[in-house]
């Protein structure tokens, strides 16, 4: 069931996509992370949003 309210949609997207993914071990990390919590790599990317 899609979310129609734009404020709730924005909140849900921010909650779901405001993470960083490690390119080495694919772990989810906090948005402000500089290193991976699992493998200590610095190779992080923001989670991609696919429409």
From Swiss-Prot:
- Gene3D superfamilies to which the protein is assigned, alphabetical: 4.10.1060.50
Where does the signal peptide begin and end? none
What are the record keywords, sorted?
A: Ribonucleoprotein, Ribosomal protein
Q: Which GO terms describe its biological process?
A: translation
Pfam families of this UniProt entry?
Ribosomal_L40e (PF01020)
GO molecular function terms listed in the Swiss-Prot or TrEMBL record: structural constituent of ribosome
Q: Which GO terms describe its cellular component?
A: ribonucleoprotein complex; ribosome
Membership in a protein family: Belongs to the eukaryotic ribosomal protein eL40 family.
PANTHER family cross-referenced by the UniProt entry: 50S RIBOSOMAL PROTEIN L40E, LARGE RIBOSOMAL SUBUNIT PROTEIN EL40
Question: What is the official name of this protein in its record?
Answer: Large ribosomal subunit protein eL40
Q: What is the species of this protein?
A: Thermofilum pendens (strain DSM 2475 / Hrk 5)
């Amino acid at each position: 069931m899609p979310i129609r309210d734009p404020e709730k949609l924005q909140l849900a997207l921010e909650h779901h996509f405001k993470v960083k993914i490690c390119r080495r071990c694919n772990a989810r990390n906090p948005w402000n992370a500089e290193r991976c919590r699992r493998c200590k790599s610095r190779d992080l990317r923001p989670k991609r949003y696919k429409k």
